[in-house]
Regions:
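Active-site rim/adjacent substrate-binding subdomains
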Residues: 1-105, 117, 121-126, 132
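Catalytic glutamate of the conserved HExxH
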Residues: 109, 113-117
Length: 133
């Protein structure tokens, strides 16, 4: 492999990775979110950094935004579009520091962002990851 010719994945590449990873998840898990929009940015915006009290824009890999089944909001958008934000630069930084495949990291972020939003346990999320391998 000629490493001198390889470029880092673009925002569009990340969106494709996210769509592929999401499609590999079990149907019952994907059904939690309905019509999901993927948004890939290099970093979270200043509001997210402030609201989450982050010290660095590298502290967050993704963010779920949307109505929540646990509070009875399912099917009631209240103007919120169901979205997953993936932050390309923090994910690439994480990838550089760990011996994991980039697609596996993106899938993990998707599962955990959706899972935490809907109150799934870590054990539930590990089972979903295992089922999607």
């Amino acid at each position: 492999m000629n490493w001198s010719q390889i470029e880092s994945p673009s925002l569009d590449d990340f969106e494709t990775l996210a769509r592929d990873a999401f499609a590999s998840l079990p149907e019952e898990f994907r059904a939690l979110v309905g019509d999901l929009v993927f948004r890939v940015d290099d970093f979270p915006d200043e509001d997210v950094i402030k609201d989450m009290e982050l010290e660095s824009e590298f502290e967050i890999l993704g963010l779920f935004q949307g109505p929540d089944l646990a509070s009875g909001e399912a099917g009631q958008s209240h103007g919120l579009q169901t979205m997953i934000f993936l932050y390309r630069r923090p994910i690439l930084d994480y990838w550089a520091e760990h011996e994991e495949k980039l697609g596996d990291i993106v899938r993990h972020v998707l599962i955990h962002e959706i899972g935490h939003h809907f109150g799934l346990s870590d054990e539930d999320m590990h089972e979903i990851e295992d089922a999607s391998d």
